[in-house]
């Protein structure tokens, strides 16, 4: 039965300027891997998540077993497989190596059966082909391969090496501490970065009780928000920050370039906006200098009045 799948990798704080891109790539890599292996229904939808301490993806309508697939192997030219005396020794050896020796003496023009040999032209010569039916992969194997590929292809700015408690050395963007993989209510026992998957996730570093057990894949996001004080969606967290900045500005104009909003979104898991201020005397400094240092050094949001001049208030998240 097709069910929702969630995969989450919990880490130390990831590079904020790369977080959004890492989250999107992680989700896209797992989705494409599962789709290529036949685990997704046509209506399956993948949603990416990224917070300072996690990369995750949720995929709807994931099959527990991929469908059986037809495999076509191009074996050898007909002239090498058959001569005047019948089937050649080379062809028999080839079929034995494929575990299909019983088909070596079959007609090369067979037209039915799940496993069969047949002759077809490749446009230049006639070849012997083997058609076989490969059993579909189980999800644990398909996800294990897809997860490994997705991690390997992540656009990580700079890898770091770290040691796990068992002494093994791992390379990743930041140390990874936990892997969650749930298909419906079931744990998918995959492994990555020397971690074995379970159903435990990490809540907010300060505002939650820490470890949180997740009952089902669909419960992951709401449980993380309600009990873990973590908004997992990068887009939802960003939208909340923008909305709260506008409210806190109290009629002033918030100077919030997109790259600053994205960076701040990548620095917090449960955003809350505060108002700060500085001595009016500092407004004698060119406002461009003040805005630059607030944005680049403090990640603050400067405020401007109706006249466009800088105020001595600022907002921080």
Give the role of each language-model region:
Residues 1-300, 304-308:
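Long, basic N-terminal domains or extensions that often function
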Residues 6, 312-317:
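Short hydrophobic beta-strand segments that form the core of ligand-binding sensory/regulatory domains
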């Amino acid at each position: 039965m097709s069910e929702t799948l969630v995969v989450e990798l919990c880490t130390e704080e990831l590079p904020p300027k790369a977080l959004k891109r890492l989250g999107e790539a992680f989700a896209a890599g797992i989705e494409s891997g599962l789709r290529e292996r036949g685990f997704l229904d046509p209506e399956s939808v993948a949603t990416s998540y990224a917070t300072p301490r996690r990369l995750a993806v949720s995929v709807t309508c994931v099959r527990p077993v991929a469908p059986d697939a037809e495999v076509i192997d191009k074996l050898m030219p007909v002239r090498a497989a058959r001569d005047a005396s019948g089937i050649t020794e080379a062809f028999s050896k080839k079929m034995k190596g494929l575990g299909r020796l019983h088909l070596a003496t079959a007609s090369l023009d067979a037209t039915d059966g799940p496993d069969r040999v047949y002759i077809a032209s490749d446009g230049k010569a006639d070849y012997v082909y083997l058609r076989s039916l490969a059993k579909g992969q189980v999800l644990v194997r398909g996800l294990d391969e897809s997860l490994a590929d997705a991690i390997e292809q992540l656009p990580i700015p700079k890898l770091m090496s770290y040691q796990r408690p068992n002494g093994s050395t791992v390379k990743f963007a930041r140390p990874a501490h936990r892997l969650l993989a749930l298909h419906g209510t079931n744990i998918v026992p995959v492994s990555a970065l020397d971690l074995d998957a379970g159903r435990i996730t990490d809540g907010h570093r300060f505002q939650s009780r820490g470890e949180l057990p997740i009952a089902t894949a669909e419960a992951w996001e709401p449980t993380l928000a309600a009990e873990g004080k973590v908004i997992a969606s990068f887009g939802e967290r960003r939208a909340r920050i923008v909305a709260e900045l506008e409210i806190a500005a109290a009629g002033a104009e918030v100077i919030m370039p997109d790259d600053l909003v994205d960076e701040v979104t990548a620095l917090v898991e449960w955003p809350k906006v505060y108002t700060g201020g500085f001595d009016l005397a500092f407004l004698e400094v060119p406002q461009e200098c003040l805005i630059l240092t607030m944005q680049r050094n403090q990640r603050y949001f400067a405020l401007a009045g109706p006249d466009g001049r800088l105020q001595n208030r600022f907002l921080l998240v």
